Amino acid sequence: MRAIISLLLISTMVFGVIEAVSVQKSLKIFEGERGDCVGESQQCADWSGPYCCKGYYCTCQYFPKCICVNDNGK
């Protein structure tokens, strides 16, 4: 009986750790912390990527040449 309870507790803890890691990865993607972001004066496309890194936004003054510019703390 103790073995069954111990096995259930261990499997619950393992599942909790796996779930926490997958949620953390999902949050990184949702927050835009992706590896495919580009910096200032780099070409971007808000609708399909590459996306601007945090602190920059994509502006399209001369389509299709959209570039990332600093958001100056907006």
Swiss-Prot record:
Superkingdom of the organism of origin: Eukaryota
Modified residues (Asparagine amide): 72
Propeptide positions: 21-34
Molecular function as annotated in GO: sodium channel regulator activity; toxin activity
Keyword 4Fe-4S: no
Disulfide-bonded cysteines: 37-53, 44-58, 52-68, 60-66
Signal peptide: 1-20
UniProt GO cellular component terms: extracellular region; host cell presynaptic membrane
Tissue: Expressed by the venom gland.
Main location: secreted
Keywords: Amidation, Disulfide bond, Ion channel impairing toxin, Knottin, Neurotoxin, Presynaptic neurotoxin, Secreted, Signal, Toxin, Voltage-gated sodium channel impairing toxin
Stored PROSITE patterns: MU_AGATOXIN (PS60015)
Subcellular location as annotated: Secreted
InterPro entries: Beta/delta-agatoxin_fam
Biological role stated in the UniProt entry: Insecticidal neurotoxin that induces an irreversible spastic paralysis when injected into insects. Modifies presynaptic voltage-gated sodium channels (Nav), causing them to open at the normal resting potential of the nerve. This leads to spontaneous release of neurotransmitter and repetitive action potentials in motor neurons.
Domain notes: The presence of a 'disulfide through disulfide knot' structurally defines this protein as a knottin.
Membership in a protein family: Belongs to the neurotoxin 07 (Beta/delta-agtx) family. 03 (aga-4) subfamily. Aga sub-subfamily.
Protein name in UniProt: U3-agatoxin-Ao1h
Organism lineage: Eukaryota, Metazoa, Ecdysozoa, Arthropoda, Chelicerata
